[in-house]
Curated annotation (Swiss-Prot):
Family named by the database record: Belongs to the thioredoxin family.
The entry's keywords: Cytoplasm, Developmental protein, Differentiation, Disulfide bond, Golgi apparatus, Redox-active center, Spermatogenesis
CDD domains in UniProt: TRX_family
Function of the molecule: May be required for post-translational modifications of proteins required for acrosomal biogenesis. May act by reducing disulfide bonds within the sperm.
Residues annotated as domain Thioredoxin: 2-127
S-S bridge residues: 32-35
Biological processes, Gene Ontology terms: acrosome assembly; spermatogenesis
Full protein name: Thioredoxin domain-containing protein 8
Tissue expression: Testis-specific. Expressed in spermatozoa, sperm tail, elongated and round spermatids.
Miscellaneous comment as given in the Swiss-Prot or TrEMBL entry: In vasectomized rats, autoantibodies against Txndc8 are present.
Taxonomic placement: Eukaryota, Metazoa, Chordata, Craniata, Vertebrata
Localization annotation: Cytoplasm; Golgi apparatus
GO CC terms, sorted: acrosomal vesicle; cytoplasm; Golgi apparatus; sperm flagellum
Species whose genome carries this gene: Rattus norvegicus
Pfam families recorded: Thioredoxin (PF00085)
Length: 127
């Protein structure tokens, strides 16, 4: 089941409740065609991977959370474990990595676009 997240509080509660499980968060918008296209597959993955938590954030109704996670494109998928964004465990193609600037900057895993095969591959790798 995909949990709808509407606030920073709900987001923090989800990450806290996940413990050591992988959390996959889709940042999307109702007007986004690719978001609509990938939604059924994302829902199906939430039923297939029961040991992974799936969540969805509407970027238009959750602007504080969208800014906090530095979302610039929809759909964007971010993955978390132990309440933190997952850092790459293996080499990733440059287009799949996002670099943050400023103090403490590091490479994090962030997947943009409606490519369900790549998303599922990363879920299997990070479980």
């Amino acid at each position: 089941m995909v949990q709808k997240i509407k606030s920073m509080r709900e987001f923090k509660e989800l990450l806290g409740a996940a413990g050591n499980r992988l959390v996959v968060v889709e940042f999307s918008a109702q007007w986004c065609g690719p978001c609509k296209m990938i939604a059924p597959a994302f829902q199906a993955m939430s039923l297939q991977y029961r040991n992974v938590m799936f969540a969805q954030v509407d970027v238009d109704s959750s602007q504080e959370l969208t800014e906090h996670c530095s979302i610039q494109v929809v759909p964007t998928f971010q993955m978390f474990k132990h309440s933190r964004k997952v850092t790459p465990f293996s080499r990733l193609k440059r287009i799949l990595c996002c670099f943050r600037s400023g103090p403490g900057s590091k490479k994090i895993f962030e997947f943009q676009g409606a490519d369900i095969e790549k998303l599922e591959e990363k879920i299997q790798e990070l479980m």
